[in-house]
């Protein structure tokens, strides 16, 4: 409590002496004062001397020998000049009554002080009345010292000084009155004044003069304003002015802004001198710039790094600027077949930092054309490819007999700040002979009671010419030690002598001159049971007998037909258990992976619908509103409530009335396709309604609709990482489809749907059929009679109708471009024929605005003319995952110095001089929706538009960040074009 009371007392200590403003001072009079006296025999004006023996006008009275004295002295009208409390300083002398011989008992040594308020000078000889009311008594004034006869003889002056105050006063002015009632005294001097708190700089703020309050205990709050180059902290700045004109109780404070330091006892905030800086607000002094940095002017908040030196985003401002490291040294490589060990020593110069790491760039130079391309994602790095902290790495899964160039980059925290590529050391190696990689997928072609025919794909990395394959198999109930091995020169084999109805485990491996590769993952297939075999024979027997009755001439044809029918019957009679097992893999393949079955291969397409799509009762479906129109009918939104499950929001495609059987079959074929897929990035089929009208396909509902329109509506609203996340989802969905041997053929942003969580899902499987052979224009016409999407389609698919997963990869590259450009039309307003011609001449789309170079490089990889050189969807997913894990890789913006060295289509901003009006210019840059806004704001000429800044663009009403950036970039180009024209004229 004692400490708290001491703190409160310190707050009340005055900060600076009060300022006194004099309203009246009798000592300054050079002539008679002329104050009113009553009665005339009382107070008398005489000349006298002050303590310094200066001549002054005084009043005296000494009627001590007469009783009942009531002598009044009234000043002239005194204007208060805004004061609320008045102070009166009186200097006077009083005769000691005891020193006066024979003085009566009525002798006094005191007098009274009064005041009277008025708005103007209205006093007369009789008004106000000479009495206490209407006069207001201030106090009775007594002398501290009085003089006697002895003092008079010795000419000793004993002057008393007393100060009294009164208030509040509110009229324009007042009078003072002095009442003597029987004393012998002299009123030597009277000074009337008021007090105010002085102008002061306290706690970094300026407080102007403030009048004191009306009472002695009053506290008048005054707001301060920060001194130049200071700003408020804590609470609003206040000081309190007390009744005596003293500042008390400081609250809050101002501090010097960043770039300024407090000097002259905190009364001035001075800009940091050249060569110093201050990053934050406060009263501390500026500090000298760290090494390799400087300031360009006074008042710096940070020091700018010198040329060639940089500061990382997280580096403190007082840390020296650093530079990029030099290249690693003494690289040692050790090749072992298709693997490689690299070791090196650290750079000679680390750039002055301790966060040195290494990146490995792998380039394959095996094409023989002198150009190297980046290695695919199949190459493995241990411990990792980027961000190595140790000077060594193990690289495996390289291609055999291939030349590689490895760049070992030295990077640190400021490498991204430098406009130059990282310093690196490179090493060239050639891999040796190696065995092939594992076979990735195997599927059943046919089966009987004692045989199974299998087929598989070639290894992803054959590493040479495949000589033959070795198939190993054994019964599931037995161990691997009981396996039997057979060889096949091709990738198809029929295994004979199996048990009826038994489940077998199969594995296959490839052989080159380098030896056998690894076995594939285990695959499970089951032979037919005797009952299944007999059933299939009975189903086909009438066909065989009927055909033989046609005669011996057709016997050979009948036998062939019977064999074919039996074979297809065997394939169709697979048990449910086999249907599940034949698609199951372990090891290399993803568990649960299935192979896509084209529903058009079914003799009865309705059978495909029954097999792959779930029939839903119409009573479970509730259509709510139409949201669009499709090729076969309307697209609606609604709800689906299945028994025992919660109600969900769904999209419903309906088949319009009056349909033909072919239209019904084509409509339901999409459900037969979708029903085979189960992946979070592929649109999910809930089921179909075929037993009532209208026929419906019911899918999950995607709240944000198609990706292209969604991006256009949200132009510039997403971060690069969010866009990469969308691309990663699309790639994951396409990887799943490719692994099922499904080719989409119409991959485009318009066929990607987006839900409320920004999850992108592949949809629209209407073009996923082979082109008809009898089409009149195979370059442009599809099996469904619609146009091939030229802008999204790979050149080999346009020219030869060769659709593969590799052609889907090309389309995916176009989707990447659509996403990064926020739904801009690929190839802009070029005609389809111009697009085909440009692609044939190896022209490719340029990077969209603000597109990271790594993403544009991936687009260019997808647009390789040779489809075998394009990445697979699995590699694309891995690449995007690495970008998401390392966002710094997305900081470098295109243009990119690519190893592919493909020419890019020029989509520069047009020269403004080719347009007659601002409206035409806005249309040309695809911003025509703002024509009216520009006109209303007065931006109707190119001279005015060229001066627009970001605040002007906002004022016009352009709120989308992408549109703001596009217009601002176009204006900057316009300025450059204007400057160029002016320089030519000069």
Curated annotation (Swiss-Prot):
Transmembrane segments: 544-564
GO molecular function: amyloid-beta binding; ATP binding; axon guidance receptor activity; ephrin receptor activity; identical protein binding; protein tyrosine kinase activity; protein-containing complex binding; signaling receptor activity
Motif PDZ-binding per record, residues: 984-986
Tissues in which the protein is found: Expressed in the epithelial dark cells of the inner ear. Expressed in the region of the proximal tubules of the kidney nephron. Expressed in myogenic progenitor cells.
Site (Cleavage) location in chain: 535-536, 561-562
Reaction(s) this enzyme catalyzes, per UniProt: L-tyrosyl-[protein] + ATP = O-phospho-L-tyrosyl-[protein] + ADP + H(+)
Domain Protein kinase span(s) in chain numbering: 621-884
All ranges on the Cytoplasmic side of the membrane: 565-986
Ranges where the Eph LBD domain occurs: 20-202
Cross-link Glycyl lysine isopeptide (Lys-Gly) (interchain with G-Cter in ubiquitin) mapped to chain: 891
Membrane topology label: Single-pass type I membrane protein
Knockout mutant characteristics: Mice are long-lived and fertile. They display strain-specific circling behavior, are hyperactive and exhibit rapid head bobbing and twirled excessively when picked-up by the tail. This is probably due to abnormal vestibular function.
Extracellular domain ranges by topology: 19-543
Active site: 746 (proton acceptor)
Localization: Cell membrane; Cell projection, Axon; Cell projection, Dendrite
Assembly mode: Heterotetramer upon binding of the ligand. The heterotetramer is composed of an ephrin dimer and a receptor dimer. Interacts (via PDZ-binding motif) with GRIP1 and PICK1 (via PDZ domain). Interacts with ARHGEF15; mediates ARHGEF15 phosphorylation, ubiquitination and degradation by the proteasome. Interacts with AQP1; involved in endolymph production in the inner ear. Interacts with EFNA5. Interacts with SPSB1. Interacts with SPSB4. Interacts with SH2D3C.
Name used for this protein in its record: Ephrin type-B receptor 2
Organism from which the protein derives: Mus musculus (Mouse)
């Amino acid at each position: 409590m004692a400490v708290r009371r001491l703190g409160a007392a310190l707050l009340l200590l005055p900060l600076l002496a009060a300022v006194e403003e004099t309203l009246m001072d009798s000592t300054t009079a050079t002539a008679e004062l002329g104050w009113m006296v009553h009665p005339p025999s009382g107070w008398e004006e005489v000349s006298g001397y002050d303590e310094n023996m200066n001549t002054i006008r005084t009043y005296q009275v000494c009627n001590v020998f007469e009783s009942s004295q009531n002598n009044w002295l009234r000043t002239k009208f005194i204007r208060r000049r805004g004061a609320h409390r008045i102070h009166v300083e009186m200097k006077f002398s009083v005769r000691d009554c005891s020193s006066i011989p024979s003085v009566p008992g009525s002798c006094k040594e005191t007098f009274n002080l009064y005041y009277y308020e008025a708005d103007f000078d209205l006093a007369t000889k009789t008004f106000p009345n000479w009495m206490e009311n209407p006069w207001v008594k201030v106090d009775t004034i007594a002398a501290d010292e009085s003089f006697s006869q002895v003092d008079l003889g010795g000419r000793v002056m004993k002057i008393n000084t007393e100060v009294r105050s009164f208030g509040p006063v509110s009229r324009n002015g007042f009078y003072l009155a002095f009442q003597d009632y029987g004393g012998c005294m002299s009123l030597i001097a009277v000074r009337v004044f008021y007090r105010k708190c002085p102008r002061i700089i306290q706690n970094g703020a300026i407080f102007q003069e403030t009048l004191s309050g009306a009472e002695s205990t009053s506290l008048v709050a005054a707001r301060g304003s920060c001194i130049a180059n200071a700003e408020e902290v804590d609470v609003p700045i206040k000081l309190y002015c007390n009744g005596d004109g003293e500042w008390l109780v400081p609250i809050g404070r101002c501090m010097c802004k960043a770039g300024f330091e407090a000097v002259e006892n905190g009364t001035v905030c001075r800009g940091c001198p050249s060569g110093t800086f201050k990053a934050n607000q406060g009263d501390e002094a500026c500090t000298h710039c760290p090494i390799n940095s400087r300031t360009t002017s006074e008042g710096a908040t940070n020091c700018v790094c010198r040329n060639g030196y940089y500061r990382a985003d997280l580096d403190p401002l007082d840390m020296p600027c650093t530079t990029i490291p030099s290249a690693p040294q003494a690289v040692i490589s050790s090749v072992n077949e298709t693997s490689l060990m690299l070791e090196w020593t650290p750079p000679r110069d680390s750039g002055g930092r301790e966060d040195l790491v290494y990146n490995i760039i792998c380039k394959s130079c095996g094409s023989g054309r002198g150009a190297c391309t980046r290695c695919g994602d199949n190459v493995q790095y241990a411990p990792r490819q980027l961000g190595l902290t140790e000077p060594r790495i193990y690289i495996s899964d390289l291609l055999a007999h291939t030349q590689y160039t490895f760049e070992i980059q030295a990077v640190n925290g400021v490498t991204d700040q430098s406009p130059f590529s990282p310093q690196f050391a490179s090493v060239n190696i050639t891999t040796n002979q190696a065995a092939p990689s594992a076979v990735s997928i195997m599927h059943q072609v046919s089966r009987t009671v004692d045989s199974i025919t299998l087929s598989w794909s070639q290894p992803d990395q054959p590493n040479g010419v495949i000589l033959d394959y070795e198939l190993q198999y054994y019964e599931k109930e037995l161990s691997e030690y009981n396996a039997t091995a057979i060889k096949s020169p091709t990738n198809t084999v029929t295994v004979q002598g199996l048990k009826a109805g038994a489940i077998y485990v199969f594995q296959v491996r490839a052989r080159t001159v380098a030896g056998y590769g690894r076995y594939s993952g285990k695959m499970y297939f089951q032979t037919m049971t005797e009952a299944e075999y007999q059933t299939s024979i009975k189903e086909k027997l009438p066909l065989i007998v009927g055909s033989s009755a046609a005669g011996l001439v057709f016997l050979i044809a009948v036998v062939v037909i019977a064999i074919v029918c039996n074979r297809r019957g065997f394939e169709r009679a697979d048990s449910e258990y086999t249907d599940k097992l034949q698609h199951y893999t372990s090891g290399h393949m993803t568990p649960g992976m299935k192979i896509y079955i084209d529903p058009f291969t079914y003799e009865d397409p309705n059978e495909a619908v029954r097999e792959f799509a779930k029939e839903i009762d119409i009573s479970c479906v509730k259509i709510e509103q139409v949201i669009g129109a499709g090729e076969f009918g309307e697209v609606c939104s609604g709800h689906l409530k299945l028994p025992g499950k919660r109600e969900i929001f769904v999209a419903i495609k309906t088949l319009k009335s009056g349909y033909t059987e072919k239209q019904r079959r084509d409509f339901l074929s999409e459900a037969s396709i979708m029903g085979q897929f189960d992946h979070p990035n592929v649109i999910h089929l809930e089921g179909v309604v075929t037993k009532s009208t209208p026929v419906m396909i019911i899918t999950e509902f995607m709240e944000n609709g198609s990706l292209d329109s969604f991006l256009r509506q949200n132009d510039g609203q997403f971060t690069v990482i969010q866009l990469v996340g969308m691309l990663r989802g699309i790639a994951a969905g396409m990887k799943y489809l490719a692994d099922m041997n499904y080719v989409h053929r119409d991959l485009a942003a318009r066929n990607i749907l987006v839900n409320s969580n920004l999850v992108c899902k592949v949809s629209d499987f209407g073009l996923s059929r082979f082109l008809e052979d009898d089409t009149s224009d195979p370059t442009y016409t599809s099996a469904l009679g619609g146009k091939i999407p030229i802008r999204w389609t790979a050149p080999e698919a346009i020219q030869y109708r060769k659709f593969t997963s590799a052609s889907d990869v090309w389309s995916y590259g176009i989707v990447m471009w659509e996403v990064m450009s926020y739904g801009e039309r690929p190839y802009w307003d070029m005609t389809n024929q111009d697009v085909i011609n440009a692609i044939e001449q190896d022209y490719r789309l340029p990077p969209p605005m603000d597109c990271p170079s790594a993403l544009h490089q991936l687009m260019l990889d997808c647009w390789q003319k040779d489809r075998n050189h394009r990445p697979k969807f699995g590699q694309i997913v891995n690449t995007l995952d690495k970008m998401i894990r390392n966002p710094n890789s997305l900081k470098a913006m295109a243009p990119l110095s690519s190893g592919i060295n493909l020419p890019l289509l020029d989509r520069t901003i047009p020269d403004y001089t080719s347009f007659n009006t601002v409206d035409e210019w806005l249309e040309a840059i695809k911003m025509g929706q703002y024509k009216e806004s520009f006109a209303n704001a007065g931006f109707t000429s190119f001279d005015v538009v060229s001066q627009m800044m970001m605040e002007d663009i906002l004022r016009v009403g352009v709120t989308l960040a992408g549109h703001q950036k596009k217009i601002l970039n176009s204006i900057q180009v316009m300025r450059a074009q204007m400057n160029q024209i002016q320089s030519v004229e000069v």
